[in-house]
């Protein structure tokens, strides 16, 4: 079974580029074990539809990378990471945990 990654972002938040690069590094060699979808959130309506936690957000099998719950009122906003954007190592570790759990 493949692990599904959903990368949610919007262009108005500059941190999505760094996280997208970290994600690209994190998945090297795992391409046959994952499927990835990039979701561009363009407005408040689409933010509500995807239950947007802010840009950038990575969902792994529908769960937030850092366990952030779905907000009561999703909106088009930049996401604040108190410890900074997740590193490629942190992302890879979380993906591998899901892969190992699924198998």
Where in the sequence are the language-model features?
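Short, solvent-exposed polar/charged micro-motifs at secondary-structure junctions
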Residues: 46-50
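Non-catalytic, surface beta->alpha helical segment in thiol-disulfide oxidoreductase systems
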Residues: 63-100
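Local sequence-structure signature of Cys/Sec-based thiol-disulfide redox active-site neighborhoods
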Residues: 1-29
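Compositionally biased, disordered extreme N-termini, encompassing classical targeting presequences
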Residues: 1-4, 99-103
